[in-house]
Amino acid sequence: CALPIYKYVYLMDIAGEVTMYYNIEIRNPSGIKIGKGTIIGENAILDGRAGLEIGNNVNFSSNVRIWTLQHDYRDPDFACNPEHYGPVKICDRAWIGPHTIILHDVTVGEGAVIAAGAVVTKDVLPYTLVGGGPAKQIGIRPRGLRYEFHGGHPKFL
């Protein structure tokens, strides 16, 4: 299990009962905090260069990409642009669908759902369902969610 490597060698802040599937790419692990009972699906990219905070009982499907920093296509050196730089926060019990991209300076509210393939460029309100590129609200989710994940999935890292 590689979780101790992330936690103790790379100084990634990981709470208990977190499940991380295979082939996850981590950028600046010391800038990432993952809450209790969160599941990170396979082939995820987690970018902690500008800070990434993931709440409790968050479900990441496969192939989720979170970018806290972007290069400037106009810069002759392809340098990172301070205008395209900022932390991402995913609040408790959010559900991130497969092949989703979440860009810098975004907060995904508690209980929010991001549909498969969405490109999230702006904050997502709590208990809303968003989809598309760029993501827009397409529904709402009931409040009062009680589910908790307790780890132990057979394919964890």
Segments predicted by a language model, with ranges:
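Short, small-residue-biased leader/transition segments that mark boundaries at the very start
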Residues: 1-3
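Short, contiguous, helix-prone interaction/anchoring segments in small proteins
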Residues: 9-15, 26-29
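Flexible, glycine/small-residue-enriched loop-and-beta-strand segment within the central core
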Residues: 24-34, 39-107, 133-134, 139-149
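Conserved catalytic segment of ABC-fold P-loop ATPases
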Residues: 109-112, 125-127
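Conserved G/P- and acidic residue-centered "switch" motifs that form tight phosphate/ATP-binding loops
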Residues: 114, 132
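Intrinsically disordered, low-complexity acidic/proline-/asparagine-rich linker or regulatory tail/stalk regions
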Residues: 149-157
